[in-house]
Design a protein with these regions (language model features):
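Solvent-exposed interhelical
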Residues: 122-140, 190
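Membrane-anchoring alpha-helices and their flanking helix-loop junctions
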Residues: 1-118, 147-201
Length: 201
């Protein structure tokens, strides 16, 4: 029980830290930025009220994957401040980032108190965006990564994105190993066949 409560406290503290970093690194806020701020405040509430998991993956590999997923977006922003990148297609990038923000917000609201960053079994959500793919939150991360890199990129940001995506793939497999213990999981997998990209994977 202590470990689980510590995880809730850690999520709360990390989210507060993310908010501080977001305000420090963002000179002017767009609507998309405010959507992400709103999401962070929602996570703060969830961290204090969410259900305790029935099963939890405490492995070092999962911890490393979660850490990588938290670090790589901010590492891109910081590196681009030190070494400016190239502009590819800003308009398309803005569209993707906006779509990603909307998808992640809807996904977070759909998850509610079942939200977590470490693979855990708190319940099974099959409604909303989870009726289209099994991991819509990670799809939003990928859309955002592509969008931000269309606005500005260099070889280092691309490398960071690849590392981040590798961590997401690991987390998907780790989460599905845990979720497979839910009685309704087999039926859900039949109903929603694809993890991230309909028709592909």
């Amino acid at each position: 029980m202590f470990g689980r409560r510590f995880a809730d406290l850690l999520l709360f503290c990390v989210t507060v830290t993310e908010l501080v970093i977001l305000f420090l690194l963002t000179p002017t806020f767009t609507i998309t930025d405010w959507v992400y701020v709103l999401q962070h405040f929602i996570v703060l509430v969830i961290a204090l009220t969410r259900r305790q998991p029935k099963v939890w993956d405490y492995s070092i590999a999962s911890s490393m994957a979660v850490g990588a997923a938290y670090v790589y977006p901010y590492a891109q922003v910081i590196y681009l401040r030190w070494s400016p990148g190239y502009v590819a297609w800003p308009a398309a990038g803005l569209v993707l980032v906006t779509l990603a923000a909307g998808l992640s917000l809807v996904t977070l609201l759909t998850l509610g108190r079942l939200f977590g960053v470490r693979p855990a079994l708190r319940g099974l959500v099959t409604s909303g965006p989870y009726g289209f793919v099994r991991h819509p939150m990670y799809l939003s991360y990928i859309l955002a990564d592509i969008g931000y890199n269309l606005q500005e990129w260099n070889s280092v940001t691309l490398l960071l994105v690849l590392v981040g995506w590798a961590s997401l793939v690991y987390r998907i497999h780790a989460e599905e190993r845990v979720l497979s213990q839910h009685a309704e999981w087999p039926a859900y997998v039949v109903l929603v066949r694809y993890r991230l990209f309909p028709g592909l994977w």
